[in-house]
Amino acid sequence: RRQRQMCIRDRPYGIGTKTPEMHADSIEGLFSQLPGVRVVMPSNPADAKGLLLASIENNDPVIFLENLHLYRSLKGEVPEGYYTTPLDQAAVAKEGSDVSIIAYGGTVPLALKAAEQLEKDGIKAEVIDLRTVAPLDIASIGKTVEKTGRVVVVQEAQRTAGIAANVMAEISERFVLNLKAPIGRVTGPDSIFPFAQAENDWAVKAEDIVNKVKEVVDYD
């Protein structure tokens, strides 16, 4: 029987452009529950190209989600020619030793911004870009937990039943003895996505990440 690859490039997700109704929904948590389906969420232009080409090549079904706000707010160098970025592998977006900020998609730039602010206060945050949220790269997650012992997980979606909860569960089951403090979580609230100016109050901000990181670092 002939085998065919299937990559579903879904509509953009995420808030930040004040779009109406359900354009801003982050539904990666729902997609991640589908057995055998990969869910890929790039955070920068170079990865967007490499991960998309890798998704097309992959024999498993892949759902490829692109952050709407990053379309308009982020620029970056993209290598010419054909290349792929490995699926199922997280990336270290910034090295650090005091705390790990685990993010993906549109929250990675926020995590990097927060890490810059934290560095001014003497806190060296490591930023992990998951890139593929289903399946999770457990090895990379474990490596950063063992390195820093403190973790904050960030997602744009609502708090309940999301990727952040999955990451926290995996850490609690596999690496709890490496933790020096309870895991922190920064998410959107459990409510309907707003639109227009109301987005400003709903959205996750770098300041929220900074505050949560300080709470985790100061835990005694």
State what each model feature region is.
Residues R1, H23-L30, E170-F175:
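A glycine- and small-aliphatic-rich helix-loop capping segment at beta-alpha/alpha-beta transitions
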Residues G16-E80, A206-D220:
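Structural signature of the thiamine diphosphate
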Residues R2-I8:
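Short, small-residue-biased leader/transition segments that mark boundaries at the very start
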Residues R9-R11, V39-S43, I63-E66, V127-I128, ...:
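General beta-strand structural signal in soluble alpha/beta enzymes
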Residues R4, V37, V62, A125, ...:
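Short, conserved active-site loop motifs that form the nucleotide-linked donor/cofactor pocket
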